[in-house]
Amino acid sequence: RGKGSEFFGVVVVNWLLTVITLGLYYPWAKERTLKYLYANTYLENDRFQFSGTGKEMFVGFIKVFGMFLFLYLAFLFAAQSQNTALSAIILLLFYAFILGIIPFAIHGFYKYRMSRTSWRGIRFGYRGDRSTLVKMYFRDLFLTILTFGIYSSWMTIHLRNYTLSNVKFGSASFKHQANGDDYFFLNLKGIILTYITLGIYSFWFQRDIINFYFDHLSLHHNDKKVKFKSHLSAGDIFELLIINLIIIVFTLGLGYAFAEVRTLTTMFSKLQIYGDIDLDAIQQTEAEYKNAFGDEALDVMDLSGVI
């Protein structure tokens, strides 16, 4: 139920303070953004709440920034020494660090973001095991490299199935049960038809991906469940992307806030939740978690798509 004009005020203040503070305000800007978006997202006329703080995210931001700064300075030193071999080693270590930190960042993201998300006073939570996720990630990464990217569809589904199936909403549990084969052929069809139609099919392709993710998600409690069903159409995607592009281009980027609100409004308005769970019977079971390292790591690396 957010309004572009209201969110625009949040975004402009965030931009100004982030620039003035040379980026240091960014975690607090992120806090204000998430709190606005959560507070304007409703289920059965009750809003969601984000209780994370800029201070928590700033600590995570500093940790991530420090790691990247160390690697950058090491590479800069190697480059200035004109030692080609050392520069190559540092560069390889940098890329290895990026690939290696992803599963830890995903785990940390879910632990923090879920514990800071609530509805009707009931917190979400994440019960996944870090070592299990790390082993799964590196196994699938190896197979993806070995198959020149073909296995990436199975890797994506394995990660989504594991992480989302370990998300809790109080005493209720989420399940994401998708098949890598189905996802592979969905992507294969989408890529081929998008290429043949010179990009026109991309709207149907994006619709299929989004609907696939939602349609395999469910929430379970006391032998009862609710399922998620997305009714997003290719026309919805086309209208959303074209109008958002026009808004952003003709406002020189200032219309980002309006585009973001339009996107979330469209996505949630097309999402149906149906089933027989008694939401009032769900009880608080999840503890707080204040380490925002994973949340900031995914943000800094712009890898939110992996979740």
Each language-model region and where it sits:
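Membrane-helix interface segments in multi-pass membrane proteins
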Residues: 70-98, 210, 214-215, 230, ...
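Juxtamembrane inter-helical linkers in multi-pass membrane proteins
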Residues: 37-51, 113-133, 162-183, 211-232, ...
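Loop-to-transmembrane boundary segments
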Residues: 4, 53-66, 129-146, 180-192, ...
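Membrane-proximal intracellular helices of multi-pass ion channels
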Residues: 57-60, 237-240, 244, 249, ...
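Hydrophobic, aromatic-rich membrane-embedded alpha-helical segments
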Residues: 11-31, 137-158, 191-207, 242-262
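Short loop/beta submotifs within extracellular cysteine-rich repeat domains
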Residues: 7-8, 56-57, 132-133, 154, ...
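Transmembrane-helix bundle segments that line or gate the permeation/cavity pathway
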Residues: 2-7, 11-84, 88-122, 126, ...
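Juxtamembrane/interface segments at transmembrane-helix termini
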Residues: 30-36, 104-116, 152-165, 201-218, ...
